[in-house]
Structure formats: C-alpha cells, structure tokens
C-alpha cells in the first residue's frame, strides 16, 4: 500500500480566550491519500491535531481557517451553596454550614439507638457530618421520615 503524506501548517491569528497571554494557535493537518482496497479502513482520513484542549470547533471559510476557543471551565472549583431536598418539603438553597447543622441535627436525633455502620465508625459526630457532606449526597433515615438529599451547586 502506498501512501503520500502532505503536511500543512496553518498559523492562525485568532487569540484564545482561555489564556492570559496572546498565544497563536497552530494546527497541523495531515492529509493521507492512498489506494486502499475495498475491505480496508482508512484510519488517517484528515486527522487534525489540536495542541490546546480548549478548542471546541473549527470553521473554514473561503480564505482562512479560523479556530474558536472558549474559556477554561472551572470544573474543580468548590462552591459553598447546596440544594437540600427533604421529604415533604420544597428544595432549599443552603450554605455548607447550614447543611452541616441540619445533618448534625438529623444524626443527633437518629430514630434508632446506633448510627448506620458507615457512620458509626467515626469517633466524633462532626467527622461523620464532614464525611456525609464531602462523600455522600443522600442520608436514608429510618422510620417514616424518608431520605434527605443534597447537591453542591454553583449559582451565577
């Protein structure tokens, strides 16, 4: 199988919004032309290597090749706001301290004498509440109370 590779380098003048410095985007595009049999698959059909992960889409017009970029998402940023869902009540927006106070109240007034095994392993009730806030999003309460759910949200 013979392949002829053609390498093109597009040096674009668009500035990326996600960077603090004025960087230019260079896109390397490799075209592969070959004579493949009918049963084979061409895995190298116009691959484009984007050097930056924030590029969403590209547009090609008559005279130039432009790249559109977005800001970097703040996926790992923490928020202090939670949505609290209690059985029989509307959703409430609460802060982390208010959520911890509510959960502490539920654990102090637990219907059964001992806490569930995953919460009973903690020495202090505050450690159990911290574990619930950071690692769990639902507390199943024994009896007819039901469950309490909370989700971390970011308000804009």
From Swiss-Prot:
The protein's UniProt keywords, in alphabetical order, are:
Chaperone, Chloroplast, Plastid, Transit peptide
This protein's transit peptide sits at 1-68
Q: Name one Pfam family in it.
A: CRR7
Q: Which GO terms describe its cellular component?
A: chloroplast; chloroplast stroma; membrane
Annotated localization? Plastid, Chloroplast stroma
Q: Upon deletion of the gene, what happens? A: Impaired chloroplastic NAD(P)H dehydrogenase (NDH) activity, probably due to a reduced stability of the NDH complex.
**What protein does this entry describe?**
Protein CHLORORESPIRATORY REDUCTION 7, chloroplastic
| Example of a GO biological process term | NAD(P)H dehydrogenase complex assembly
Q: Which domain of life is it from?
A: Eukaryota
Tell me the function of this protein.
Required for both formation and activity of the chloroplast NAD(P)H dehydrogenase (NDH) complex of the photosynthetic electron transport chain. May function in assembly or stabilization of the NDH complex. Required for the accumulation of NDH subcomplex A, which is a core part of NDH. May be involved in post-translational steps during the biogenesis of subcomplex A.
């Amino acid at each position: 199988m013979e392949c002829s590779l053609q390498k093109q380098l597009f040096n674009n003048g668009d500035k990326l919004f996600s960077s603090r410095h004025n960087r230019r985007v260079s896109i390397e595009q490799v075209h592969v032309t070959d004579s493949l049999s009918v049963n084979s698959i061409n895995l190298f059909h116009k691959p484009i290597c984007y050097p930056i992960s924030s590029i969403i889409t590209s547009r090609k017009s008559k005279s130039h090749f432009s790249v559109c970029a977005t800001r970097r998402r703040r996926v790992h940023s923490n928020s202090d706001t939670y949505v609290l869902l209690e059985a029989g009540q509307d959703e409430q927006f609460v802060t982390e301290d208010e959520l911890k106070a509510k959960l502490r109240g539920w654990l102090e007034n637990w219907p059964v004498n001992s806490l569930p095994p995953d919460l009973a392993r903690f020495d202090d009730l505050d450690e159990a509440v911290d574990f619930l806030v950071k690692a769990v999003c639902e507390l199943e309460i024994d009896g007819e109370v039901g469950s309490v759910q909370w989700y971390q949200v970011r308000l804009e």
